[in-house]
């Protein structure tokens, strides 16, 4: 899909935090594998993936990729992430940010110059930011907002929707970049305004889920017309 190519091209970055979110079965692992594949094609990078389970095997091309499976090669995401940081990777893929320790370590890894990819089961960019902040106790939340505003490069939220011919599903992507206005909203605890920014920033490559669904419908790719509650901004 064109959207997937746009995501691949934009997020082969050098550092920062890129989150891919959505419900179970929405294709998050496929999107992450595509991003790692892009890096493998273009960068002489050391990549460590931490997965539960490993779904896609990556061969070495330009990048050196070490894949580790939670439960087989390591006890937990938090333990695996701490161990990975001692190996001086350029890129770390964390299959899922499940708990405070993993989230905190992933943010720290992004702060210290690594490119970190991970997933959450949230729907929508604003809900993703809120979920991360809410994991932390109240006295830490403002500091986490500041850290997250610095390191966040993107939130890609996706859904799989039945196609017009009812023979398959098509991916719809909400895309939020870590622009200065977005970073300011995160820092100021105004995530409720993110949906408004997404609706007016398409020239910057951002799009709300409602608009993404409408685009698919207008291109005759959806079986039914999208309702506002189909999107992540409702």
List the predicted regions and their residue ranges.
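Short, flexible helix-loop junctions that flank or precede catalytic/ligand sites
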Residues: 1-4, 8-225, 229
């Amino acid at each position: 899909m064109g959207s997937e190519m746009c995501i691949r091209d934009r997020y082969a970055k050098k550092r920062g935090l890129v989150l891919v979110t959505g419900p179970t079965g929405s294709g998050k692992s496929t999107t992450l594998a595509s991003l790692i594949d892009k890096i493998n094609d273009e960068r002489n990078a050391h990549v460590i993936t931490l997965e539960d389970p490993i779904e896609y095997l990556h061969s070495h091309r330009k990048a050196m990729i070490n894949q580790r499976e939670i439960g087989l090669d390591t006890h937990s995401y938090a333990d695996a992430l701490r161990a990975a940081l001692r190996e001086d990777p350029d890129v770390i893929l964390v299959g899922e940010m499940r708990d405070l320790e993993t989230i905190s370590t992933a943010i720290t890894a992004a702060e210290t110059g690594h490119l970190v990819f991970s997933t959450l089961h949230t729907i929508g960019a604003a809900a993703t930011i809120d979920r991360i902040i809410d994991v932390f106790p109240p006295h830490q939340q403002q500091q986490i907002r500041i850290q997250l505003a610095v390191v966040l490069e993107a939130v890609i939220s996706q859904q799989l929707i039945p196609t017009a011919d009812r023979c398959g599903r098509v991916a719809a992507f909400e895309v939020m970049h870590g622009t200065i206005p977005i970073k300011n909203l995160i820092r100021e605890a105004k995530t409720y305004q993110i949906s408004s920014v997404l609706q007016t920033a398409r020239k910057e490559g951002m799009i709300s889920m409602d608009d993404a669904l409408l685009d698919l419908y207008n291109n005759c790719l959806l079986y039914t017309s999208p309702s506002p509650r189909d999107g992540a901004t409702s």
